[in-house]
Curated annotation (Swiss-Prot):
This is DNA-directed RNA polymerase subunit beta'. GO terms for cellular component: DNA-directed RNA polymerase complex. InterPro entries: DNA-dir_RpoC_beta_prime, DNA-dir_RpoC_beta_prime_bact, RNA_pol_asu, RNA_pol_N, RNA_pol_Rpb1_1, RNA_pol_Rpb1_3, RNA_pol_Rpb1_3_sf, RNA_pol_Rpb1_4. It is an enzyme of class 2 (transferase). Coiled coil: none annotated. GO terms for biological process: DNA-templated transcription. NCBIfam families: rpoC_TIGR. Keywords: DNA-directed RNA polymerase, Magnesium, Metal-binding, Nucleotidyltransferase, Transcription, Transferase, Zinc. The keyword Iron-sulfur does not apply. Binds 1 Mg(2+) ion per subunit. Binds 2 Zn(2+) ions per subunit.
Length: 1295
């Protein structure tokens, strides 16, 4: 089957004038659009039917030919081809421009591509294009030489003529007996005049010599030179001049010249030559011609892509493009007319400039000068505006399409549903499944045809709902809650038809969707094809999505009422009815409870299945009944954390279906016993502790002392502030302890907080104790505590202070949401082509995972290595036993064994060191945390990584902490810190780090503070003497370089005979040690670095400390670029992973290291070429690391010199824009710049990522196995059914 979509790459390049003409169906010569009386397009206008095709299907403009039978005929009267009206969406026209025009993308970009190629500044280029200056386009060297000679001859002739004239005059004056003074005056005047004449001629000669191709001339200079030397040079202005210059460029010669320049120059000139060389190479490789950047023919967009629609009042609404095209055509026609009638040059020049401006506005309105407005102040949307931004073609229509077979409604809780089900309102389901219901009605003979089936559905007859029930049985639906932050925000459910208008959602999936029932809405989508249904059922069903892909923790854990119910069920109540009774087995105990003889929470003794006597409660027996037999009896209180652990363990034992059944049972238990517990909260449940008054009074006293000391000048403002804060923090902790000690363990408030259902001790402290210290909007703690509790009520001042935090919280949430969303978008873009494409890349490299020194800052080693593959044997330090072999997965048992063995570092495979040239391999990635197994082939791990980091972004704080009282340092934390790291920006407070190993010396004097690092490395140079040689030096003697150390001892010959080149000479200066036939010279190489320390920075080292390169000398954050340059690639990767992990872990968000490693890998995947060697690479070019290694390997195999390069750390935005796929980069940011570069380089998009395939409408490369099978099956089915007549009016997917 030959499909339009059957291609695997897309190339973009510059269009030549001939290509533009070949696309066109005719020239647009008139600015008219449609005739306002007949409402038909004007001939040769912007909507002409002859050029673009008929307005009505198979009907020409004059009406001579109608119907499909005339298809392909061109009407002899009106010239319109008989075809479908939809050809007006694809047929283009063209405008033959009266003069060449510069394409604004190539003339005005930064840097300007035309300017770079012609070595012109943007300012000079603008002067030429907009007809202000002339540029020399050609110089005739022979004519110049001849002109110079002629000038010299003219000069000599003039001087000679003038000389003879003066001689005649002098002779005449002598004859008239004139004074000597008068004669001398004439001679002096002649001398001055001769000098002036020579000077004028020399100036003209210099001007001639200075005439070079590409030089700019003002109008006056041009006319002056043209008058005298019209045959020496040619100059012109406008895009015409540039077209001429660009067409003269010989790319091969230009390349050789620039290569020479990059090697022989340095600094700014070399940098510019490097950029020019890259551009020249781009034109050479892409077979684009530079003159195509100047347009002589302008393509005209098909009319249906710039429509004109009649409104109700008879007026017309039109696309802005039509107005912009109209301006171009009007000016072009006027210019042609002026040129034909031979108008003055100045008028023609002005019209040419106006044409250039009109074309600029059409291509990119507002890039130069004032934007062209239509209808008053509304800025016209140009072709570039249609592509760029959120509302542009890429993001609005290609990446974010609206879909049919979808609906939306409010969600309510569905406590009676199974985990895999959702409640779908009948009316909604009927509309969504309408075609399927109609098809079934016809098939079952309930309706004779589709039309009557539609009528039956619209009347909603009872048999229709019976059919609907059958249809939805085998068709899952997708539920989506916006914002779709991660994979779990879209899940598949089996629909259960319900009455009412609201969707019903299972309470356990709420946390995955981050949904609650306060008015949230969700969207429903219907998977249509068999492949889609199969994928939804096998991978998207909620029972297959119970674990978080970010951390591997359960996401379907019970919450709120369910947690409280389970906690209440498993707690004990001393003195309850039936306490101390003994039962023979669990069933007997449950029977006695049901008869009301014993209380649910009474402590009883029961014999378990193994014959052991347990002290437990009936509630715990009931709870354990729902757990699998493999899980031992849980004889304890079950709060939220315990439920999470139990679910995690059960997931490894049970299948998805059994797991769902167990979770549903826990849910039912939770709801049942939360209801029967009869929990409620009253004001009386919150009691203020008696100790509060004393503690507050003591704190007030300590505060008064600090204030008094400050008033007397004994302590500073900082010390006073810190003392007060410390006092009240301590008091708050003591009151919290007092509240906890006085709690009624059976009280509803305590049980709610302790179970993890709702609330925590901090909130109870604010209700019963005191609210404590508050922060101001900048994040600084206010040194005025709120001493009242919410139970007692706040004073007006206390209430005012507490509003600061509340308002800041709301503002933060709003800002965080957008910031987090943008971060996720950038992360998605940088990793969207990271897909598992290989089983094993075979690398021996890996990364060391080390037990963190600061507990609580990073996850423990056991958590970080779980699910990874080893890159080396893991050996028990005491016994020498191999715990895990090389290249083997570390599962829970092995991870536990590693922890118990006391191993503090493990060498594991990592995405950072994966050597797959495209995507990644399974072993380096390891376990898919959401599925708890080795990652499947074709999994889009890049997207998963981006979602895992972006999704909890809204939970991160948005503030920079202000430390140390009044004058302090801002420490960036939370979301801004994550962004700072991923964008590889210099930190706000940048730490100074040592570039070398050495010893510290801290210097403080009137010039400020300095740190000097001195490094003394001692080396040895050894010289082994042959036997019979005589040493010329002694031990501990100092020798200089070049000094003789030993010489051969020759008998009977004088010393003069011994050749000097036979002696052993010292290669270095140092101290000698002689030991037999071995001479050793010890020498040291010292290195020193000095750093100036700003006054606000805190020094972290002291004099005499020995430090390593890369170690911090001051507080603050390290610039990742410094780590890369000093310590290299591995160190910067480790730094990025650990720093991002610290931010999330400190906020209680668990993300696996591998997700951050995937991003870090993409940030370091490019290298910058230093020297090209024998390769085609250009110095300064950014190249993919793997491509660079491949090119070098080929060159080395052929015996050539390889290129050299250094690793580049790029921020995620830059990395996204420098991706191999130009489609993905253009749809991200800076659309016009990306497309400009891609066109010049003639880039080929191999369609290896996800975005580029979504844009062109192909299936993404990350397909699951079942989906691939179903797609093949469907293609075969369609091929088989192509010959059979389809049932009229049915969707293709019903086949």
């Amino acid at each position: 089957m030959n499909e339009v979509n059957d291609f695997d790459a897309i190339r973009i390049s510059l269009a030549s004038p001939d290509q533009i003409r070949s696309w066109s169906y005719g020239e647009v010569t008139k600015p008219e659009t449609i005739n306002y009386r007949t409402l038909k397009p004007e001939r040769d206008g912007l909507f002409c039917e002859r050029i673009f095709g008929p307005i009505k299907d198979f009907e020409c403009a004059c009406g001579k030919y109608k119907r499909i039978r005339y298809k392909g005929i061109i009407c002899d009267k009106c010239g319109v081809e008989i075809a479908r009206a939809k050809v007006r969406r694809e047929r283009m026209g063209h405008i033959e421009l009266a003069c060449p025009v510069g394409h604004i993308w190539f003339t005005r970009g930064i840097p300007s591509r035309v300017g770079l190629l012609l070595n012109l500044s943007t300012r000079s280029l603008e002067r030429i294009i907009y007809y202000s200056h002339f540029i020399i386009t050609a110089v005739n060297d022979d004519a110049r030489e001849k002109a110079i000679k002629d000038l010299e001859v003219i000069s000599s002739q003039r001087v000679a003529d003038k000389g003879s004239e003066v001689d005649t005059r002098v002779a005449q004056m002598e004859a008239e007996d004139a004074t000597v003074e008068a004669i001398n005056q004439i001679r002096r005047d002649f001398s001055t005049e001769r000098e002036q004449m020579e000077e004028d001629i020399q100036l003209l000669i210099d001007q001639l010599k200075d005439l070079q191709k590409g030089n700019l001339l003002t109008e006056n200079q041009y006319y002056e030179l043209k008058q005298r030397f019209s045959n020496v040079f040619e100059a012109s202005m406008g895009a015409e001049a540039l077209l001429k210059l660009l067409s003269y460029i010989d790319m091969d010669k230009e390349r050789s010249k620039l290569i020479q320049e990059t090697r022989s120059t340095s600094g700014q000139r070399r940098k510019k030559a490097g950029k020019q060389l890259q551009l020249v190479e781009a034109f050479r490789r892409s077979s684009n011609k530079p003159e195509w950047m100047i347009m002589t023919v302008l393509p005209v967009l098909p009319p249906d892509l710039r429509p004109m629609v009649q409104l109700d009042g008879g007026r017309f609404a039109t696309s802005d493009l039509n107005d912009l095209y109209r301006r171009v055509i009007n000016r072009n026609n006027r210019l042609q007319h002026l040129m034909e009638i031979g108008a003055p040059e100045i008028i023609i020049r002005n019209e040419k400039r106006m044409l250039q401006e009109a074309v600029d506005s059409l291509i990119d309105n507002g890039r130069r000068g004032k934007s062209v407005a239509v209808n008053g102040d509304h800025k016209a949307k140009s072709l570039s505006d249609l592509l760029r931004g959120k509302q542009g073609r890429f993001r609005q229509n290609l990446l974010g399409k609206r879909v049919d077979y979808s609906g939306r409604s409010v969600i309510v809780v569905g406590p009676s549903l199974k985990l895999s089900q959702c409640g779908l309102p009948r009316r909604m389901a009927l509309e969504l499944f309408k075609p399927f219901v109609m098809h079934r009605l016809v098939r079952d003979g309930l309706a004779p045809n589709i039309k009557s089936a539609r009528r039956l559905v619209e009347r909603a007859r009872p048999e229709v709902y019976d059919i609907l029930e059958e249809v939805v049985k085998d068709r899952p639906v997708l539920l989506n809650r916006a914002p779709t932050l991660h994979r779990l925000s879209i899940q598949a459910f089996e629909p259960v038809l319900i009455d009412g208008s609201a969707l019903r959602l299972h309470p356990l999936v709420c946390s995955a969707f981050n949904a609650d029932f306060d008015g949230d809405q969700m969207a429903v989508h219907v998977p249509l094809s068999k492949a889609a249904v199969k994928e939804a059922r096998e991978t998207m069903l909620s029972i297959h999505n119970m674990m978080l892909p970010s951390s591997g923790e359960p996401v379907v854990s019970p919450s709120l009422d369910m947690v409280f119910g389970c906690y209440y069920l498993t707690t004990t109540r001393p003195g309850a009815k039936g306490e101390g009774k003994i039962f023979g087995d669990f069933e007997e105990a449950k029977r006695y409870y049901e008869m009301g003889i014993i209380d649910l929470r009474a402590i009883i003794k029961v014999r378990d299945g193994k014959g052991n006597m347990l002290e437990t409660t009936t509630g715990r027996i009931i709870f354990n009944d729902v757990l699998p037999k493999a899980v031992e009896f849980q004889n304890m209180d079950i709060p939220k954390s315990a439920i999470k652990k139990i679910i995690g363990r059960c997931y490894k034992i049970l299948s998805s279906q059994d797991m769902a059944v167990m979770l549903d049972k826990i849910k039912e238990l939770g709801f049942k016993f939360a209801t029967s517990s009869g929990i409620s909260i009253a004001m009386s449940d919150i009691s203020v502790p008696r100790e509060k008054t004393k503690l507050v009074a003591a704190a007030d006293e300590r505060t008064a002392i600090a204030e008094g000391q400050f008033a007397r000048g004994l302590i500073t403002e900082d010390e006073r502030y810190n003392s007060i804060i410390e006092t009240w923090m301590e008091t708050t902790d003591r009151i919290t302890d007092a509240i906890q000690a006085g709690f009624d363990k059976q009280g509803s408030v305590y049980m709610m907080a302790n179970s993890g259902a709702k609330g925590n001790i901090s909130q109870i402290r604010q209700m019963a104790g005191l609210r404590g210290l508050m922060t101001n909007p900048s994040g600084r703690i206010i040194d005025f505590p709120i001493k009242s509790s919410l139970r007692e009520g706040l004073t007006a001042l206390e209430y005012f202070i507490s509003t600061h935090g509340a308002r800041k919280g709301l503002a933060d949430t709003a800002l965080r949401t957008s910031g987090s969303g943008y971060l996720t978008r950038r992360l998605i873009d940088v990793t969207q082509d990271v897909i598992i494409l290989q089983e094993d890349c075979g690398t021996a490299n890996g990364t060391w995972i080390i037990e963190p020194k600061e507990k609580g800052m990073l996850p423990p080693l056991v958590d970080r290595i779980l699910g990874r593959w080893t890159a080396h044997n893991v050996v028990h330090p005491q016994t020498g036993e191999i715990i895990v072999d090389n290249n083997e997965e570390i599962d829970e048992i092995k991870a536990k064994a590693i922890g118990e063995a006391g191993i503090t570092e493990v060498f594991v495979r990592s995405p950072l060191t994966c050597e797959s040239t495209h995507g990644m391999c399974r072993r380096c990635y390891g376990r898919d945390l959401g599925r708890v197994r080795l990652v499947d082939m074709n999994t889009a791990v890049g997207i998963i990584a981006a979602q895992s980091i972006g999704e909890p972004g809204t939970q991160l704080t948005l503030r920079t902490f202000h430390t140390g009282g009044v004058v302090g340092v801002d420490i960036t934390t939370g979301l801004p810190r994550v962004e700072e790291l991923f964008e590889a920006r210099p930190p706000k407070v940048q730490s100074i780090i040592s570039e070398i190993d050495g010893v510290v010396e801290v210097i403080e004097n009137e010039n400020g503070r300095h740190i000097r690092i001195a490094s003394d490395e001692v080396y040895q140079d050894e010289y082994e003497l042959p036997s019979g040689w005589k040493t010329q030096v002694q031990s501990r003697q100092w020798v200089d370089s070049g000094m003789v150390l030993a010489s051969p001892e020759l008998e009977g010959k004088s010393k003069a005979v011994v050749q000097s080149d036979q002696n052993v000479v010292a290669r270095v200066a140092g101290e000698v040690t002689v030991e037999g036939n071995l001479i050793t010279i010890k020498y040291s190489e010292s290195e020193e670095r000095e750093y100036t320390i700003p006054a606000a920075m805190q020094i972290k080292v002291k004099t005499g400390d020995t430090i390593r390169a890369g170690q911090q000398l001051t507080d603050g954050s390290i610039n990742p670029q410094d780590i890369l340059s000093i310590l290299g690639r591995d160190a910067v990767q480790k730094y990025l992973v650990e720093e991002v992990q610290k931010v999330y872990y400190s906020q209680g968000v668990h993300i696996n290291d591998k997700h951050i490693e995937v991003i870090a890998r993409q940030m370091l995947i490019k290298v910058r070429i230093d020297s090209s060697g024998d390769t085609d690479l250009v110095p300064g070019e950014l190249v993919d690391k793997f491509r660079y290694e491949d090119i070098n390997a080929k060159v080395l195999a052929e015996g050539g010199e390889p290129a050299t390069a250094h690793t580049v750390l790029m921020g995620i935005t830059r990395a996204s824009l420098s991706t191999e796929s130009w489609l993905a980069a253009a749809s991200f940011q800076e659309t016009t710049r990306v497309l400009t570069d891609a066109a010049i380089y003639g880039r080929v998009d191999k369609l290896s990522g996800l975005k580029e395939n979504v844009i062109i409408g192909k299936l993404i490369p990350a397909q699951c196995k079942s989906c691939k099978e179903a797609t093949i099956e469907r293609a075969e089915r369609i091929a088989a059914a192509a010959s059979a007549p389809a049932m009229s009016g049915l969707p293709e997917n019903c086949l």
